[in-house]
Design a protein with these regions (language model features):
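Glycine-/acidic-rich phosphate or pyrophosphate-binding loops and their flanking alpha/beta elements
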Residues: 1-14
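Conserved beta-strand elements of the Class I
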Residues: 17-19
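TOPRIM fold recognition
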Residues: 14-15, 26-134
Length: 134
């Protein structure tokens, strides 16, 4: 399967990838976080709420070490499944969008920076938070 914006992941340079669902999410993240010329961080899209073995292999083959799952806030179960699939290969964090109804392209620059500065969660922290929210 394809990864949108995969060409922005540079061999042995890009160590962190932000995983989003769709093209517009990647465009919003790239624009608002100014990732155009950042060789260490790239945003890519899986075209949905799942990641395939081929997509995982593609990220591994480029030397990516850290993956931040940035799926939409309403994709709780998909985030958990994706995190479990990625954990054996990468250091995994989840970008916790507080408002489940919003996508990356609906968030302001300040909101996005706030998520990446203060609300990146480990897989365990994310799972515990979601249990507490029930």
């Amino acid at each position: 399967r394809l990864l949108y914006n995969y060409d922005a992941v540079r061999m042995d340079e890009t160590d962190t990838v932000i995983l989003a669902e769709g093209i517009f999410d990647v465009i919003a993240l790239t624009r608002r976080l100014e990732l155009y010329d950042n060789s260490h961080v790239a945003a890519v899209a899986t075209f949905g709420k799942k990641i395939s073995d081929v997509q995982i292999y593609k990220l591994q083959s480029k030397g990516v070490r850290t993956v931040v799952i940035g799926y939409d806030g309403d994709a709780v179960e998909s985030v958990k499944r994706t995190a479990e699939r990625l954990k054996p290969y990468f250091e995994v964090f989840i970008a916790d969008i507080a408002d489940a109804a919003k996508d990356w392209d609906e968030l302001t620059e300040a909101e996005i920076y706030g998520i990446f500065a203060c609300r990146l969660l480990s897989v365990l922290e994310y799972k515990l938070k979601k249990v507490q929210e029930r």
